[in-house]
Amino acid sequence: MQYVSTRAAASAASQSPQQFSDILLGGLAPDGGLYLPTEYPQVTGAELDAWRKLSYAELAFEILKKFATDIPEADLKALTAKTYTADVYRNVREGESAADITPLRVLEASKGRKLVLQALSNGPTLAFKDMAMQLLGNLFEYALAKKNAELNIFGATSGDTGSAAEYAMRGKKGIRVFMLSPHKKMSAFQTAQMFSLQDPNIFNIAVEGVFDDCQDMVKAVSNDLPFKAKQKIGTVNSINWARVVAQVVYYFRGYLAATTSNEQKVSFTCLLYTSPSPRD
C-alpha cells in the first residue's frame, strides 16, 4: 500500500508515493497536503464472517495489515496484541468485560431494532482518543527503532488529545512530547492527568491565551519545513493517517458485535461528552 498527498496533482515534489512507515512519522506531506492511500482495500463477505470470531487485537491486525504493508505481519500482529489488552482498557462499567476492549451494551430493543452503546473510553485517560493513541505510541516506537531515529512530537491541546497522547508516548524510546495547552483553560481532571506525569520524555507547556494560540504555534512550526526536518518534529493529531486507520477498527468492531449476519445494517451516531472548561 502506497500513499500520496491530497495536493499531489498541484505539486510535482509530492508525486513520489510513500510507504506507511514513512507517513507515520512525517504527518503532513511536504506540500502541506494530507496523505491518503493510492487505493482503498476491499473487504469481502467471507472476511467479515471470519472477523466475527476475532478478538479486538486480532481484528485490528487484519484491518491494519491492509494499510501497513511495509511492516512484516508478525511484527504488526505483535504490536496490536501489545496495544489492545484488558489491562490497558480496564476502566469498564460493572458487568462489562475489559477483554472486549470496546464492549457493547443494549440500551433499548423494540420491534426488531436495537439501540446499542459502544464504549470507547475505557483506556488510561478515559477518552476515546486512547483507542488510536495507544497504538500510535507503539507504532512510533517500532518504526523509530527500525530507523535508529528519534522524534519530537509537538502538539496543542485543550484537554483529551494531550492527555491521551502523553499516556501513549510516556516511556517510549526515541520519543519526546512537547504539548502546549491554554493556561487555566482545561478541566481540572485533564490538567491533573497531564501535569502530574513525571516521565522524562514528557514536556507540558502552559500558554497564556486560548487553544487557538497554542494551535497557531504548532501550525507555524509545521509549515517551517527546514526547521521541522532539522528538529525531527512529528504529530499525533488527526492529520496522521495511522491514527485514522486505528479508529477505523472500532467501527468494524461495533458493526460485527451488534449484528449476526452481513445482511444486517447499522447506523452509527457519535456521542461525545465534554467537561466544561473553567471560566477566566
Predicted features and spans:
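Small-residue-rich anion-binding loops in enzyme active sites
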Residues: P37-L126, Q198-K228
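Conserved small/polar residues in nucleotide/adenosyl-binding loops
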Residues: T274-D280
